[in-house]
Amino acid sequence: MKVLFVYPRFQRHAQAHPELLEYVPMNEYLGSPSLGIAALAAVMPAHWELEFRDDRLTDAARPTDADLVALSFFTAAATRGLELADFFRAQGKPTVAGGLFTTAMPDVVLQHVDSVVVGEGEGAWLKLLQDFEAGGLQRRYERIPVDLTALPAPKVSLYIDGEGPSFHPDDYPVQLSRGCPLNCHSCILPVSMTKQLREFTLSQVVAQLDQLGAKGKRACLTEDTSWLPGKGNRLLESLFDHLIAQGKEATVSYVGISMPMILSTPIALLHKARRAGVTMFYLVGGFDPVTMRAFTGKDERQLERAHKAIAKCFEADIEPYTSFLYGQDDDDVGTVDRMLEFARASGIRKAEFAIFTPYPGTPSFARLEAEGRITSREWRRYNDANCVYQPKQLTAEQVTEGYLRLWREFYADKSYFQDRCHDERTIQF
């Protein structure tokens, strides 16, 4: 039997706002698909044949000889994902879907597919395959708990084998853990992966790094919450110790982290990360108390903490690639100036800017929908480049204008990026 996995395309920042290509002196960078499809492919029974289509590279809406079509998508790709589901069902193909949007809005997706997988996929996926082979698909499969330490490595070769001139990432994601005990207002992770922090073993992580290294790729550690103080730090420290001992300092490209995580992490661990080859932090902003308040003009303490977090990165010789989120309820017309001044004063060299987006399944979406402030359910617009709700102090037009100004003015004096090597002058926008 044969399954066709499909990763739907979505509108990127520079597609929504082509002027960004004029503002930013970098190459637009197409990153790897998320790990969902690769994780399911890894647990497929041996008698199943696999095919993968990345709709970002070539139009996936074409006939297939597969027995089953499986789509995985997050909110920004949901409009296209549902279009593709309709296409394959019209071709007479049983079609199923999973991913973050499906987990958040299963009833919406069920209008377009034969079956959905809600939540963490591997266990439910195997049950779905058993039912399909027996001729009796259920409409809905809920998460079945799995032991992470027993899972095989995601089959990222599906992605790497599809590389070409327009798609050749320098790195691919590697997970150290799943789940998160926090409840950030705009994050779906506790819903999709539960609030329990569960870890892979060090040997599993090292095996994934070695597989990528054999393909000439590095790992980016951005798909989990491993920098949470305590247990997660211990696994990270063990990984860094391994990389240093093995002389594999070029294995990890960058690591996802937040300002509170930086502030709570001992400087010795940051120095160890640098010795292990970590040269850049992807500094996620807008979800935590520091970055939600630092640029409001009303909280000097959080602004000071933000400066300390950036200074701590520089102290460890790790570049803070900083993500700024604009358009939240506490933001006003002066927030853009305050963000730009902070970036200048703190010495940030590389940044990205996004519009606050209340994703389905998050506390923010539920609250704003209850307040009648969601202004669009056109899911393709939920890509961090459009204002899809009504902020308290700004109009949607002001949010868009401020977002574009952030990109334009931050990169106005950074033409030197044009002369940098490939991995130094690429940015996903």
Report each predicted region and the residues it spans:
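C-terminal accessory regions of radical SAM enzymes
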Residues: K2-E22, N27, A41, G334-E352, ...
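Hydrophobic/aromatic residues located in beta-strands of well-ordered beta-sheets
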Residues: V3, L50, T95, A219, ...
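Structural detector of well-ordered beta-strand residues that form the stable sheet scaffold
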Residues: V96, V117, R140, S253-V255, ...
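Acidic, low-complexity intrinsically disordered segments
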Residues: M1-L212
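Short, solvent-exposed turn/loop segments enriched in Gly/Ser/Thr/Pro and often Arg
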Residues: D224-L228, S258-M259, Y326-D330, A354-P363
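Glycine-enriched alpha-helix->loop->beta-strand junction motifs that scaffold or abut catalytic
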Residues: V113, R274-M280, S346-R349
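Radical SAM [4Fe-4S] cluster-binding motif and immediate context
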Residues: V156-Y321, E341
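Catalytic cores of alpha/beta
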Residues: P106-Q111, L269, D329-R344
